[in-house]
A protein has these predicted regions:
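Phosphate/nucleotide-binding beta-alpha loop and adjacent structural elements of enzyme active sites
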Residues: 1-268
Length: 268
């Protein structure tokens, strides 16, 4: 089972902390559910509907256990842009940190946006502005390959469809300060982030989930150059250690990507 595999490769002290035990409980309850079947899940005081338990379990691990999005704010009403809000886990976390946060949530995939809207409202969160569009380098629409849970992408292999888009650069330019900008847009970051370069000076904290798709330029240096020129310090992490990388070129259990990184950037 997924929970047992996770425990066997994780330090035993995971069981000593409340958050660790909660994580293990999530793995036990939901980690081995059949893939891509809509399910109801529960953690803490929250109840959600998700299109795929496996993807959701890893979201929980990154957001609530690893706390990739935790940040300090000088105001109780931080401005947060959540690009790639998916089913709403990140927003629940942000609202737990800062209940009065002013959040704009962008989700490109229409079916996932329905989950997002329903999950926020069913958990009493009604003050988030949800934009059912892709963030992009223009507002003319962008072609996405269809996905099932969290993998719809401009590089997707599924049926292509034109998704309405909004130019993120223009959205950010309207704000005096953005306390936290989250970008998890399945490969589109290599186009979107450079387009935003001249407005990133108003961003205080930046999270980018970087994706490199097989057959496409990796372009990590393109992303990091933008981040460095904007004056950020940054830390890079991956949620998948790879043995024998000269042999194992692909991202494990993924036939379309060969690299995924979490980039956390902040003002020194």
């Amino acid at each position: 089972m997924l929970a047992l595999k996770y425990l066997l490769k994780t330090p035993f002290h995971l069981l000593r902390s409340r958050s660790g035990r909660q994580l293990l409980s999530i793995f036990w309850r939901y980690g081995d559910k059949p893939r891509y079947q809509p399910s109801k899940v529960k953690f803490g005081n929250y109840q959600l509907e998700v299109p795929d338990c496996f993807s959701w379990v890893w979201q929980y691990e990154e957001i609530y256990f690893e706390e990739y999005y935790r940040f300090n704010s000088s105001t109780p009403t931080p401005v947060i842009y959540d690009c790639g809000a998916n089913v709403g886990m990140s927003i629940l976390y942000f609202k737990q940190l800062y209940p009065q946060a002013q959040i704009k949530a962008y989700e490109a995939e229409p079916q996932i946006a329905e989950y997002l809207t329903k999950n926020l409202h069913s958990n009493g969160i009604n003050d988030v502005k949800i934009i059912q569009k892709a963030v992009w380098k223009d507002s003319l629409g962008v072609e996405f390959g269809e996905g099932q849970a969290d993998d719809a992408s401009i590089y997707g292999q599924g049926n292509k469809k034109l998704i309405p888009s909004v130019r993120l650069r223009d959205e950010l330019a309207q704000e005096k300060t953005i306390d936290f900008l989250k970008i998890d847009i399945e490969g589109a970051e290599i186009e979107v982030l450079p387009d935003c370069a001249n407005v990133l000076d108003r961003v205080q904290h930046l999270f980018v989930e970087f994706h490199a798709y097989i057959g496409q330029p990796q372009a990590l240096t393109k992303v990091l150059e933008v981040i460095e020129k904007a004056g950020f310090r940054y830390y890079i992490d991956t949620n998948q250690h790879r043995k024998a990388p000269f042999i194992n070129h692909r991202y494990r259990n993924n036939n379309v990507m060969d690299l995924q990184l979490n980039i956390s950037a902040w003002r020194p």
